[in-house]
């Protein structure tokens, strides 16, 4: 779907690749861009920063809360009309603890934001898209959703769920011959601050590159887009290599199983 003259909603749109995608959509001629974020000050700053590029509006939303999503969706529809392109981008990494040290709160927070949040948001807009016969849903997941990673068990679990749901949603739309498109984006780790401290054999991705390729995938109506080497070949290698070989290649040689050992994450203001 072409972004020009479309109304685009980006969750987590006030930092990282969400903010970059919001900016790029305006540069591509979007009719209006809507950013959702949990941080009201960040919303005000983002709207002010991007307003010179076009029409941009921001609303507070906690995507972990169905009630908050309901309120934000109603406000968005009343103020901005129908959403043509939904980019489910918001996400977190709670910590780098092993699973045995996690709490119920850690589990709920990660699953609610990284897996269920995109589902809550999509439910509020997909009905309108189907009845209008136009729409594109882009889900930003992660190559971690195809791997087992120590000290990242909650994040990988949520991203496995997100990929499975996103791909299933795409197939449902295709089976009913709906014009509504679904794109799953699975990038490797991104240099946005969210992954600060990670040490990787593979290249940490510049956020501008991820944003550019994600938006290009929307414009080309791609169903799936992996970004960087691991995202392209993980499934193939898991399918053809014995489990011990895969662990040796990615865990021992490439060091993927120790990437979280020095994780610090984005510093809080």
Named regions from a protein language model:
Residues 2-34:
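Canonical Rossmann dinucleotide-binding motif of NAD(H)/NADP(H)-dependent dehydrogenases/reductases
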Residues 97-99, 103-109:
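Substrate-binding pocket helix/loop in short-chain dehydrogenase/reductase
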Residues 40-41, 60-71, 104:
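The beta1-alpha1 cofactor-binding region of Rossmann-like NAD(H)/NADP(H)-dependent oxidoreductases
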Residues 122, 158:
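Active-site helix of classical SDR
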Residues 171-231:
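SDR active-site lid
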Residues 142:
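Residue(s) in the substrate-gating loop at a strand-loop-helix junction
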Residues 30-45:
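Conserved glycine-rich Rossmann-like NAD(P)H-binding loop of the short-chain dehydrogenase/reductase
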């Amino acid at each position: 779907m072409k972004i020009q003259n479309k109304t685009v909603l980006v969750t987590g749109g006030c930092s990282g690749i969400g903010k970059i995608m919001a900016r790029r959509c305006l540069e591509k001629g979007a009719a209006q861009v809507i950013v959702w974020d949990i941080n009201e000050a960040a919303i005000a700053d983002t709207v002010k920063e991007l307003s010179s590029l076009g029409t941009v509006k921001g609303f507070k939303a906690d995507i972990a809360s169905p009630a908050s999503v309901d309120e934000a969706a109603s406000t968005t529809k009343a103020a901005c009309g129908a959403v043509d392109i939904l980019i489910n981008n918001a996400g977190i990494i709670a910590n780098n603890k092993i699973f045995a040290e996690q709490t119920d709160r850690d589990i709920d927070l990660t699953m609610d934001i990284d897996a269920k949040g995109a589902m809550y948001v999509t439910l509020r807009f997909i009905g309108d898209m189907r009845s209008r016969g136009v729409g594109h849903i882009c889900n930003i997941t992660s190559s971690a959703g195809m791997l087992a990673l120590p000290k990242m068990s909650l994040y990988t679990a949520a991203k496995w769920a997100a990929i499975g749901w996103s791909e299933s949603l795409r197939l449902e739309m295709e089976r009913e011959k709906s014009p509504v498109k679904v794109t799953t984006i699975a990038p490797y780790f991104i240099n946005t601050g969210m992954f600060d401290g990670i040490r990787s054999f593979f290249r940490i991705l510049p956020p501008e590159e991820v944003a550019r390729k994600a938006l290009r995938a929307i414009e080309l109506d791609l169903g799936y887009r992996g970004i960087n080497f691991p995202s392209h070949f993980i499934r193939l290698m898991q399918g053809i290599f014995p489990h011990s070989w895969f662990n040796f290649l990615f865990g021992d040689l490439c060091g993927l199983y120790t990437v979280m050992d020095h994780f610090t994450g984005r510093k809080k203001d």
